Amino acid sequence: MFYDRASKGEIAMSVNINIRNAVKRYGNTTVIENLTLSIRGGEFFTLLGPSGCGKTTLLRMIAGFNSIEGGDFYFNDTRINDLNPAKRNIGMVFQNYAIFPHMNVRKNVEFGLKNRPADKRIDKKLIHGQADKFLKLMQIDQLADRMPAQLSGGQQQRVALARALCIEPDVLLMDEPLSNLDAKLRVEMRTAIKEIQNSVGITTVYVTHDQEEAMAVSDRIAVMNGGVIQHVGTPKNIYQRPANTFVATFIGRSNILKGEMEVEGGKAVVSLPTGYKAAFDTVAPENLKKQPVTLCARPEELIVETGEGEGLKAVIDSCVFLGLNTHYFVHLLSGEKAEIIQESSIDSIIKPGTQVRLRLNTEKANLFTQDGSRNLLTGVENDLVKEAV
């Protein structure tokens, strides 16, 4: 008889995924080399990065759709390298939905259960009941008799997700599932997906290049570039204390400035363009030394002020009023360009051509080595480093 773990009140489908020293090659080209990653049972884990970074390749290696040229993949204690994809008990949601156009919604959702191996088949009544449960969970039970051509993009994606979950997989894999939806529907669906994942408790690996989407749905994120994982952490950790300048500039927007760090009275003082000096209290003790540095300041971490005083000297090039916030685009007198997001004032907006000064919020801004490869501040939490130890 089919065992319904979710209805028993258990934490269903909670499987750890452990990847050790993974290698993927296409001919003589190595696209992933010596990649190690641990995904916790029940978490919503996102692989985030630009096109061609290897995120979908890694997802397909987990699924069994791509060959593995090196390393080990585990679901809990079971090594899955040579396990047939059909026996991995995974649910997969694709970018193009991949629902069957000749089947109605109910038949699509029931498909996985009806086509299980002979030793795992269940009674038709149980299949019907299981489909009902996930049709209701996805709020598409009223569409059960419709054909895919009669559905909107969002409804089709709900069908694809219901079909993937109906087999009660150990792992749910999602490859850019929202990229074909319009902006408003993407926001609605990402909220629905996160709520459903929380209620079901399934280990979920999600692929996207959309930073905001990743921040909204994920328990943790792995930022990838060139087949290499750069940073693994919570959305908050990755945004506030990125491991390197790639992560800092890929997650959100950042202004990059070169500076020189010196130590005065046991604290770091960074000399920046136009003669502005900023004191940092959060440089890690082992990094407190005279050295060239790279400063990363997000638009909201710079404050525009007029009049005399300390700050980076700049000129307003243009501004965009967006209600709550105003975006200022400036150039420093030393030549660099910067963007600032500031809460809109009840008074007039600062006009283009006005000379201003920019003050830096040193509690939030980040300092990196000159080459940008390492964050020099305390509070950087990178689970990738912990896993490698």
Give names to the regions the model predicted.
Residues G71-R79:
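Conserved ABC transporter NBD signature motif
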Residues S254, E264-V389:
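Non-catalytic connector elements of ABC transporters
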Residues E69-D72, G226, K258:
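Conserved coupling/switch loops of ABC nucleotide-binding domains, chiefly the family-specific signature
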Residues L48-P50:
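The feature captures the beta-strand-to-loop junction immediately N-terminal to the Walker
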